[in-house]
């Protein structure tokens, strides 16, 4: 995949804004609805906590790479790597459908005692992501590399990491909205 940096960042900012707006609607729900579970599936709060756990890693990693690469000349074009493009495409919601995957144990929030603070923590992370995405406008997203949460042995191009992380948020927003709709039916 090849795309202009600004077009990519604008798309990721749009997706981040949509996710933020979706979660702000969840703030008005009673805690019982936020904790509601259907079978072995996650609750709305568990979906958000899962994203918070990933945010704890990726937001720090993204910021670290922005700082490490800010003095390099930026490139106008982002060229996705093979592995990064694969992971990003695996996460992306396509036609309202998501590929089901098993979450790593350290990112699985099932049966945690979660409160409304899970939502405020998520919204703070979304604010931080917005700032970082805007900072990426002056970074070469192809040359800058970032670690991934599964293993430190693999590094992705920063643009692919941004896509993966943003698409991952989007897929769990869809999951949380489905949980919310199930309760209404």
Give the residues covered by each predicted segment.
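Intrinsically disordered, low-complexity segments enriched in polar/charged residues with Gly/Pro
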Residues: 12-13, 20-21, 27-29, 151-153
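Acidic/histidine-rich alpha-helical segments that form the ligand environment
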Residues: 19, 25-28, 84-140
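A short small-residue
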Residues: 1-2, 33-34, 102-110, 149-152
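Extreme N-terminal tail/first-helix region
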Residues: 1-17, 21
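Short amphipathic alpha-helical segments with heptad-repeat character
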Residues: 10-13, 17, 48, 52, ...
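Active-site oxyanion-binding pockets that recognize sulfate/phosphate
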Residues: 2-9, 41-44, 111-119, 155, ...
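Short, contiguous alpha-helical
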Residues: 34-89, 127, 131-135, 139-185
């Amino acid at each position: 995949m090849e795309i202009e940096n600004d077009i990519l960042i604008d798309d990721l900012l749009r997706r981040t804004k949509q996710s933020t707006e979706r979660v702000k609607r969840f703030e008005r729900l009673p805690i019982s609805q936020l904790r509601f579970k259907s079978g072995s599936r996650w609750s709305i709060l568990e979906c958000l906590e899962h994203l918070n756990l990933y945010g704890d890693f990726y937001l720090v990693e993204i910021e670290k790479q922005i700082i490490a690469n800010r003095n390099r000349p930026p490139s106008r074009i982002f060229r996705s790597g093979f592995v990064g493009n694969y992971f990003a495409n695996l996460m992306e919601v396509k036609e309202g459908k998501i590929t089901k995957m098993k979450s790593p144990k350290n990112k699985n929030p099932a049966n945690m005692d979660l409160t409304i603070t899970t939502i405020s923590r998520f919204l703070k992370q979304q604010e931080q992501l917005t700032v970082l995405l805007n900072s990426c406008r002056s970074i070469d997203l192809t040359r800058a590399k970032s670690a991934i949460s599964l293993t430190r042995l693999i590094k992705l191009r920063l643009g692919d990491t941004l896509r993966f992380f943003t698409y991952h948020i989007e897929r769990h927003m869809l999951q949380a909205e489905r949980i919310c709709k199930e309760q209404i039916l």
